[in-house]
Amino acid sequence: MNRLPSSASALACCAHALNLIEKRTLSHEEMKALNREVIDYFKEHVNPGFLEYRKSVTAGGDYGAVEWQAGSLNTLVNTQGQEFIDCLGGFGIFNVGHRNPVVVSAVQNQLAKQPLHSQELLDPLRAILAKTLAALTPGKLKYSFFCNSGTESVEAALKLAKAYQSPRGKFTFIATSGAFHGKSLGALSATAKSTFRKPFMPLLPGFRHVTFGNINAMRMAFSEGKKTGDEIAAVILEPIQGEGGVILPPQGYLTEVRKLCDEFGALMILDEVQTGMGRTGKMFACEHENVQPDILCLAKALGGGVMPIGATIATEEVFSVLFDNPFLHTTTFGGNPLACAAALATINVLLEQNLPAQAEQKGDTLLDGFRQLAREYPDLVHDARGKGMLMAIEFVDNETGYRFASEMFRQRVLVAGTLNNAKTIRIEPPLTLTIELCEQVLKSARNALAAMQVSVEEV
């Protein structure tokens, strides 16, 4: 039966939400009511499937799935007032921590002046951010297109590569197995997981997938394309596959891919949406091999965990295809003043506090600890790997991974699996995580594994 629109009901919902936004704390009864409300609304109006996938943080009926506010730079607080060390980092958005005061202040100051731009006049922060990224990024990267997410930055990169290479008779893209580049139609064509791809087949033509980290497979794809006249326009890959399970390629792989691109006249697109902004111990992961891409995709942490923003940065030679008609690819909210303010403040924090170097140091501490635990619990843990503050613990099967996430939640540490690899638990905390909290995370992981081992032995 169709229901009639209700302005009164919508107005009541808005008033209720605005009241919640104003509050800093909730009474016990308010907390219980809000939890019931949120779960019900997700079931009836968002997507009931999300509730099943949050099972690792709902054990024991503690309503932990409903978060309330940031606790500190490195923690979250739920509606019960329980504080959790954040080792998930919003899948890589909180590199400078939660509500970093420098970023929040910049956004608040810009909000007091002008939240969004007119679309017609030139906006200064977009210009300054583009100049900043040209200075910060490696090689000849010079021009920036701004958007709102990683998927959008990948879409822009693919369109830019097409516009550049189509007149040269090159139309095919090489992506890699295990890749995740987003879920919009173009980005999904480069993404490798069948679960995400099959419901939307056929995807865009002209994408080949080769084994990640295998330079011989990459060379063969280039050679076959040359022989058949189906030449390669561009290679798109992640320096480290995040959603694929934090998969690191062999040392020198990116360098060899760059050489192949140069040899065959293809563009190199690096998707650093997750690995960029200091996450792996360098500002950009490609800097570990001094590789310079033709197009670089950024998002997630670029907005400092305060505003959504993505960027597609390219060399002048490539970007010049948009010079004659800059309206070939645009977006209403891309590069808006609030987002640019957040990005500029984020870069300032990363550089002034030398957070990439901190990520390397703290990441080494955590990874050493996780590898020791892997040696102690071989029946549960298959591997521990990573670079900087992008790490993964791979368990023997999916269910063991879920159990670890649930046990860590009981220890007040938030972790989760990766999208392409459910048995792999990602460890991706803010780069601001203190040494003391690193030690607490390792202690919690040890406690979680010990509890899991006892459970296995009892069975």
Swiss-Prot record:
InterPro entries in alphabetical order: Aminotrans_3, Aminotrans_3_PPA_site, Class-III_PLP-dep_AT, Putrescine_aminotransferase, PyrdxlP-dep_Trfase, PyrdxlP-dep_Trfase_major, PyrdxlP-dep_Trfase_small
Pathway, per record: Amine and polyamine degradation; putrescine degradation; 4-aminobutanal from putrescine (transaminase route): step 1/1
Enzyme Commission numbers on file: 2.6.1.82, 2.6.1.29
Reactions accelerated catalytically: an alkane-alpha,omega-diamine + 2-oxoglutarate = an omega-aminoaldehyde + L-glutamate; putrescine + 2-oxoglutarate = 1-pyrroline + L-glutamate + H2O; cadaverine + 2-oxoglutarate = 5-aminopentanal + L-glutamate
GO terms classed as biological process: L-lysine catabolic process; putrescine catabolic process
Residues with the N6-(pyridoxal phosphate)lysine modification: 300
Keywords: Aminotransferase, Pyridoxal phosphate, Transferase
Record: residues binding pyridoxal 5'-phosphate: 150-151, 274, 332
Cofactor (UniProt): pyridoxal 5'-phosphate
Protein's UniProt keywords contain Transferase: yes
GO molecular function per UniProt: diamine transaminase activity; identical protein binding; putrescine--2-oxoglutarate transaminase activity; pyridoxal phosphate binding
SUPFAM superfamilies for the chain: PLP-dependent transferases
Family: Belongs to the class-III pyridoxal-phosphate-dependent aminotransferase family. Putrescine aminotransferase subfamily.
Function (record text): Catalyzes the aminotransferase reaction from putrescine to 2-oxoglutarate, leading to glutamate and 4-aminobutanal, which spontaneously cyclizes to form 1-pyrroline. This is the first step in one of two pathways for putrescine degradation, where putrescine is converted into 4-aminobutanoate (gamma-aminobutyrate or GABA) via 4-aminobutanal. Also functions as a cadaverine transaminase in a a L-lysine degradation pathway to succinate that proceeds via cadaverine, glutarate and L-2-hydroxyglutarate.
Protein name: Putrescine aminotransferase
Source organism: Salmonella arizonae (strain ATCC BAA-731 / CDC346-86 / RSK2980)
Taxonomic lineage of the native organism: Bacteria, Pseudomonadati, Pseudomonadota, Gammaproteobacteria, Enterobacterales
